[in-house]
Amino acid sequence: MLKLVQYIAPRVGGATPRPTACGWGNLLLISPRSGASSEKCITQRRHFLFSSASSSGTFASSSSLCTEQRQQFHGSRRNRETILFPSTYSSLQAQSQRAFRDSSKPDSDDYVDSIPKAEQRTRTRKSLFNDPDERTEEIKIEGVMAPHDRDFGHSGRGGRGGDRGGDDRRGGGGGGNRFGGGGGGGDYHGIRNGRVEKRRDDRGGGNRFGGGGGFGDRRGGGGGGSQDLPMRPVDFSNLAPFKKNFYQEHPNVANRSPYEVQRYREEQEITVRGQVPNPIQDFSEVHLPDYVMKEIRRQGYKAPTAIQAQGWPIAMSGSNFVGIAKTGSGKTLGYILPAIVHINNQQPLQRGDGPIALVLAPTRELAQQIQQVATEFGSSSYVRNTCVFGGAPKGGQMRDLQRGCEIVIATPGRLIDFLSAGSTNLKRCTYLVLDEADRMLDMGFEPQIRKIVSQIRPDRQTLMWSATWPKEVKQLAEDFLGNYIQINIGSLELSANHNIRQVVDVCDEFSKEEKLKTLLSDIYDTSESPGKIIIFVETKRRVDNLVRFIRSFGVRCGAIHGDKSQSERDFVLREFRSGKSNILVATDVAARGLDVDGIKYVINFDYPQNSEDYIHRIGRTGRSNTKGTSFAFFTKNNAKQAKALVDVLREANQEINPALENLARNSRYDGGGGRSRYGGGGGGGRFGGGGFKKGSLSNGRGFGGGGGGGGEGRHSRFD
């Protein structure tokens, strides 16, 4: 045993060997200090020494230990065993692994002896993670500030779902109320320039989209709070005029009778509100510049989609408007081409100017997809663009902003960082786009959006795009757009793309892997070119497990989830787009904004928490009027979603599995909590979780603490 420790010890502390102790059953193994002249001291590491299950554990040490070392552990240190030593054997392996990684931390004796004895007596055995499904434990010592302790200062955690009548700031206040507050964000402790810093950047409580504590900097569960970042005030008293009406109605469009216009709108399922120009029916009728038309012809577009046919005349006339359309309807071109025309009719950017057109998107994948379209159609007219999002280095993004770009595509959080730092400004912005506004509100970005819009001149042109039209999006449109035009493509009710064949398999949880294997075998056996396949699951761990399962059969497979770095995501998407890997396993980060040609199949290995996410997942196929197929494994654990799924299938004229109908009839659930705007839900996510049951008061997890229990979820669209 001693040889084992002697072998391990030099490899734990880096280049300089350090004495190391390790628990092995009921034994305490201690390595000598390699190269030291004396063995009169021993290093005691936090989370590293282990006792037996009883508080008075039995220790057997090497004969090489000196008297002082034995006294340290059997004498004066006996009172600390119950504090520093875990009392159970169940976490031995996890803690020993953590200890080897933490070998560079200060010696535990020095760490503890520096605490006044009065404070040592007040130590507690609270662990960082009390939830049974967590793998590691931390020991909290009052008076010692650790970067990851559960209680940080005076307002350590957001609360654990807490009392319904409690303080919103400490969780629980939102219980029973769909718009209730969540837990407050804990103080953030970090290390910078060798010093411990403490700040409170945001508070998860108070947001109307469920609960959610924050972990310091912008990591709130559920709705999360707004960032409390300083913004420079903007003076709008002396604004230079600008032009925003560039639309010239084509004679063919002007000469169409009201009957012809109405018939076309009915065929395309277009409904309008307000004074709306007639729709175009051909690219030649919109008077786009030659360089834009050349790119349209090069990419093989034959006719505008419904959202483009009706949206381009509105956007190019300078009007504010809201477009409600399902995924894959061509809305990106619906605002990018008018943006290019708008930019080319403005004064050139000067040094220090910000963008002329700003596009806000909820996710980095969608932002990158928008940038690709902007580059394809803007490069011929030298319209520069940049994409600003979190998860990537700031340096290159900052340089692009400082050099000047006519179009900036951004996620709200990263853009606020640059605005607060003075890296860019929005004084020249006259064309604003909010893409997937409903998704941004679901993700709790409303405070950030309002802060950004407050920096833009009020006479701007604003275009808002959404897949649904709930009252939260409607309120945002009324606040930002004023007198606006609204167009809807298809039904206002949430509905699936009718070009997608939907198959639902009601099965047991344990049989899903075998069913996936059979399904993939059938797809590959029945087609020489199976196309691309996306498999959606609920958790990051399951993504990794499923990728290993698929690769075990010799099939190339990529993975995307929130813990992947931006370079990893980019590599996986390049492989997927090029066809080198035609299977992608992902969480919901790929459910929106991922526009990849050739996706023929979408498989819902785990059914999502609500039908809105299901519709957006399967919307990755069947895009641009192509056909696609979706499969869903539906278990009894998803029974509360059965009624909503049956409604989605029935609206799309799909065949309904009798077992699913039986679940829908017998389900005792009615709506459920949910994590989106259609119900409350505790603070979701890894950094401040809560449950999704009705009025759940389930514990918050992770670093922020959970918000209060959500509402009863009676607002579900499919109740």
Swiss-Prot record:
Residue ranges constituting the Helicase C-terminal domain according to the UniProt record: 519-664
Entry's Gene Ontology cellular component terms: catalytic step 2 spliceosome; cytoplasm; cytosol; nucleolus; nucleus; polytene chromosome; polytene chromosome puff; precatalytic spliceosome
Keyword Metal-binding carried by entry: no
UniProt entry tagged with the keyword Nucleus: yes
Protein name: ATP-dependent RNA helicase p62
An example Gene Ontology biological process: siRNA-mediated heterochromatin formation
Subcellular location: Nucleus; Nucleus, Nucleolus; Cytoplasm, Cytosol
Its job: As an RNA helicase, unwinds RNA and alters RNA structures through ATP binding and hydrolysis. Involved in multiple cellular processes, including pre-mRNA splicing, alternative splicing, rRNA processing and miRNA processing, as well as transcription regulation. Plays a role in innate immunity. Specifically restricts bunyavirus infection, including Rift Valley fever virus (RVFV) or La Crosse virus (LACV), but not vesicular stomatitis virus (VSV), in an interferon- and DROSHA-independent manner.
Region (Disordered): 94-234, 689-719
Broadest EC class assigned to this enzyme: hydrolase
Enzyme Commission number(s): 3.6.4.13
Disruption phenotype: No phenotype under normal conditions. Upon infection with Rift Valley fever virus (RVFV) or La Crosse virus (LACV), knockdown flies exhibit increased mortality. No phenotype upon infection with other viruses, including vesicular stomatitis virus (VSV), Sindbis virus (SINV), nor Drosophila C virus (DCV).
Keywords: Antiviral defense, ATP-binding, Cytoplasm, Helicase, Hydrolase, Immunity, mRNA processing, mRNA splicing, Nucleotide-binding, Nucleus, RNA-binding, RNA-mediated gene silencing, Translation regulation
